[in-house]
Amino acid sequence: MAVGKNKRLSKGKKGLKKRTQDPFSRKDEYSVKAPSTFAIRDVGKTLVNRTTGLKNANDALKGRIFEVSLADLQNDEDHAFRKVKLRVDEVQGKNCLTNFHGLDFTSDKLRSLVRKWQTLIEANVTVKTTDDYLLRLFAIAFTKRRPNQIKKTTYAQSSQIRAIRKKMVEIIQREAGTRSLAQLTKLIPEVIGREIEKATHGIYPLQNVHIRKVKLLKSPKFDLGALLALHGESSTDDKGQKVEREFKETVLESV
């Protein structure tokens, strides 16, 4: 008789003795801080595996990119269709200090702008800021009806399109090339678009002129001092600073 395994014999199950560990018990929570150029600096929280052995939590956090609505950062719903990318450059305590990494439009906003009976004009420019950031800015514009126009269509001639595009490139180079990255992030949402609209009014009236996308091509060598200056020269939590200011004001009022 052949000797084999008796399958009917009950075996002890190995899996029962193992206890499942919650993966979140090994993680730490860090606050993500936006640069001081934005009105709201608390972006949110991010999770990372706790430092163990040679694996450092700070190294895992550096380089992370967060996409945030500009409406949340500026506390203004008019900017809801703009998305800002923030990159973690430094970790201090439980705070992740970020820097501007790019800007984009939501796809639904872009689709809502494109319509019939008008001309779409696009331009892209590669510029270097005064603090050596290499950026590529993409501009978009649409033709609109002149006052008292009867004709339904507002198509621009190819010569007019070339003239408008030339103006767009000139304005973007002038505005972006003479400013730092922090100053440029304030201008991108509204100011540059309005400048283009004013300058090209004589060629053909435009509407919905926007910088629809900003791409960061190259960053200068990392400078901790510059990053801390961008975050208000302090790595501590903003809440502490606000309480101190409020406390001083109440003392002055009571005196």
Swiss-Prot record:
Biological processes annotated in GO: translation
Alphabetized UniProt keyword annotations: Acetylation, Cytoplasm, Ribonucleoprotein, Ribosomal protein
Modified residues (N-acetylalanine): A2
Source organism, top-level taxon: Eukaryota
Region (Disordered): 1-28
Ranges of biased composition (kind: Basic residues): 1-18
Pfam families associated with the record: Ribosomal_S3Ae (PF01015)
Subcellular localization, as worded in the UniProt entry: Cytoplasm
Keyword Transferase recorded: no
GO molecular function, one term: structural constituent of ribosome
Compositional bias segments (type: Basic and acidic residues): 19-28
Any one GO cellular component localisation term in the record: cytosolic small ribosomal subunit
HAMAP family, per the entry: Ribosomal_eS1_euk
PANTHER family the record matches: 40S RIBOSOMAL PROTEIN S3A
Family membership noted in the UniProt record: Belongs to the eukaryotic ribosomal protein eS1 family.
Subunit relationships: Component of the small ribosomal subunit. Mature ribosomes consist of a small (40S) and a large (60S) subunit. The 40S subunit contains about 33 different proteins and 1 molecule of RNA (18S). The 60S subunit contains about 49 different proteins and 3 molecules of RNA (25S, 5.8S and 5S).
Protein name, per record: Small ribosomal subunit protein eS1
Provenance organism: Paracoccidioides brasiliensis (strain Pb18)
